């Protein structure tokens, strides 16, 4: 069972939202976003296997992670995935279409690394440099990562102070390594044509990890999707531009989705 932070709904709530974090993080990455979402929404932020408080059963597998979340969903839900969590969300929507009402993918990807027919991906050396820094001193570099995301954000210190203590409990080194290896190997491009739900894509114009070209690729492949690029955001638009992001997502979910 994956641990999750859950916010109960008001009695008339009809929507259920699941938030899926990215690599090297946990459910507390969404602690600043959750209070900005409508109080009538029941919201669950889940931990991926081996992250946060969730147990780790080897090996880390993207499809298995999606299946585990699907097992928690009892009616079509609105799924928001960030970075690696967006990849998990794609697998969830393709493998369990009856469990997904809509998708919001923010700073995410169908494939992370570049190849001959996918120039939108990252070059391996750039990815390796970033990951190496996190491996050497996670607590130091996750704080620096947050500081960079919130560079021009009012109350940046307050946001970091609220989420960093719980976020720093990132999971076991083995789980993080296997999750990264799985992300590097994963290729969900063959799943995109199977997805037939409303999709909102939100990317940061200054994101060097999942640059907007990855969002443009998803937009071309996911029929009926909507792409929004927040020009001054980087890899975590829901943190750096929390109010705008929350309003955008609220309008997407409550405004008919398409």
Curated annotation (Swiss-Prot):
Domain AB hydrolase-1: 17-241
One function term, GO molecular function aspect: pimelyl-[acyl-carrier protein] methyl ester esterase activity
SUPFAM superfamilies: alpha/beta-Hydrolases (SSF53474)
Family annotation (Gene3D superfamilies): alpha/beta hydrolase
Origin: domain of life: Bacteria
Organism, scientific name: Neisseria meningitidis serogroup B (strain ATCC BAA-335 / MC58)
One Gene Ontology CC term in the entry: cytoplasm
GO BP annotations, alphabetical order: biotin biosynthetic process
Complexes and interactors: Monomer.
UniProt-recorded name of the protein: Pimeloyl-[acyl-carrier protein] methyl ester esterase
Catalytic activity: 6-carboxyhexanoyl-[ACP] methyl ester + H2O = 6-carboxyhexanoyl-[ACP] + methanol + H(+)
Keywords: Biotin biosynthesis, Cytoplasm, Hydrolase, Serine esterase
This enzyme's EC code(s): 3.1.1.85
Role description: The physiological role of BioH is to remove the methyl group introduced by BioC when the pimeloyl moiety is complete. It allows to synthesize pimeloyl-ACP via the fatty acid synthetic pathway through the hydrolysis of the ester bonds of pimeloyl-ACP esters.
Family statement drawn from the similarity comment of this UniProt entry: Belongs to the AB hydrolase superfamily. Carboxylesterase BioH family.
Residues reported to bind substrate: 23, 83-84, 145-149, 235
Positions annotated as active site in the UniProt record: 83 (nucleophile), 207, 235
Keyword Cytoplasm among record annotations: yes
Localization annotation: Cytoplasm
NCBIfam families named in the record: bioH
Recorded name of the encoding gene: bioH
